[in-house]
Amino acid sequence: MKIVEVKHPLVKHKLGLMREHDISTKRFRELASEVGSLLTYEATADLATEKVTIEGWNGPVEVEQIKGKKITVVPILRAGLGMMEGVLEHVPSARISVVGIYRNEETLEPVPYFQKLVSNIDERMALVVDPMLATGGSMIATIDLLKNAGCTSIKVLVLVAAPEGIAALEKAHPDVELYTASVDKGLNEHGYIIPGLGDAGDKIFGTK
């Protein structure tokens, strides 16, 4: 599995701000979108382009455009919504597929409860977004759904990832690509990433 920890100074700085314990909901939400945007920049760096001729201000001019690669953004509810706008800044014409999966706090197992995928997902590259890759259960379940629907090109974008989650994802889906702002130390006894970000969903939506 291709694993990319984005080490750009802007990514590290913004992620560091997000780790503040008393960060406001507004600021956390803004930064989640901004880091999501920067991760998208990295994840789409290998998109193929083609040369086309357009009418410029002084006559015909040859330019490069992305070569027919359709994209769907797949936020995992609910926290993934906090990164979605940042992704769409770079790919505004992308279609949106939504997957709802929550983690049982006792068993730590993923529980699917909703999915709405674009009809031609087999023709698209999926950018799956979720702030945290902890145990990997929710991400693996989401990718299972996408593959069952025919999607074969999948990239995962997360703010922070635990080594345990990375290992689980690689074992289940070695063909996907992972882009993260940080590989953190690991999980605590409750299955939360350390140092992590706390509960990203609560911080994005202002709930507890």
UniProtKB/Swiss-Prot annotation:
Residues annotated for uracil binding in this entry: I193, G198, D199, A200
Pfam families the record matches: UPRTase
Swiss-Prot/TrEMBL keywords: Allosteric enzyme, Glycosyltransferase, GTP-binding, Magnesium, Nucleotide-binding, Transferase
Tagged with keyword GTP-binding: yes
Record-listed E.C. numbers: 2.4.2.9
Keyword match Acyltransferase: no
Uppermost EC category: transferase
Stated family: Belongs to the UPRTase family.
GO biological process: UMP salvage; uracil salvage
Binding-site residues, 5-phospho-alpha-D-ribose 1-diphosphate: R78, R103, D130, P131, M132, L133, A134, T135, G136, G137, S138, D199
UniProt gene name: upp
Entry's cofactor comment: Binds 1 Mg(2+) ion per subunit. The magnesium is bound as Mg-PRPP.
Metabolic or biological pathway, per its Swiss-Prot or TrEMBL entry: Pyrimidine metabolism; UMP biosynthesis via salvage pathway; UMP from uracil: step 1/1
Name under which the protein is recorded: Uracil phosphoribosyltransferase
